[in-house]
């Protein structure tokens, strides 16, 4: 069990140290405004932190609400997390492709649904890659 960092923000060095921990779940929560002409899922498929799963903010929302990105029901959220291999005993680290933009929204959603072991990666993928930390394009086996 990861317990040496109960903070809401984790450093790239902390994540690198714990990258292979079986209790860690890394989420790429990248989402961009339409005018940015970027696609978080496509970027995830090209390059992500090893072991990261993609958290689709558009899909994990209340699809019955006409407003975009409204919080989903607890049932939908829990169902999607189980499908991603995320359970109560996991430490979650969220990042995004801008540094810290949409990852904060994902963090907030976990907190809203009572998950305390969740943190945002300080500097996100830009900082991670600027430090020459590893990336890959392999989708993890969800367990």
Go through each PLM region and give its residues.
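Cytosolic catalytic domains that perform sulfur/thiol-centered chemistry
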Residues: 1-143
């Amino acid at each position: 069990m990861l317990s040496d960092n109960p903070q809401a923000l984790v450093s790239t060095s902390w994540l690198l140290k714990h990258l292979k921990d079986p209790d860690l779940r890394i989420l790429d929560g990248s989402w961009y405004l339409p005018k940015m002409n970027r696609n978080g899922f496509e970027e995830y498929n090209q390059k992500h932190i090893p072991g990261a799963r993609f958290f689709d903010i558009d899909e994990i929302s209340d699809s019955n609400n006409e407003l975009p990105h409204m919080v989903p029901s607890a049932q939908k959220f829990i169902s999607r997390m189980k499908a991603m291999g995320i359970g109560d005993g996991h430490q979650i680290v969220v990042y995004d492709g801008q540094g810290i933009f949409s990852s904060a929204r994902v963090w907030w959603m976990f907190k809203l649904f009572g998950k305390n072991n969740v943190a945002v990666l300080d500097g996100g993928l830009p900082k991670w890659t600027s430090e020459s930390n590893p990336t890959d394009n392999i989708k993890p086996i969800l367990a």
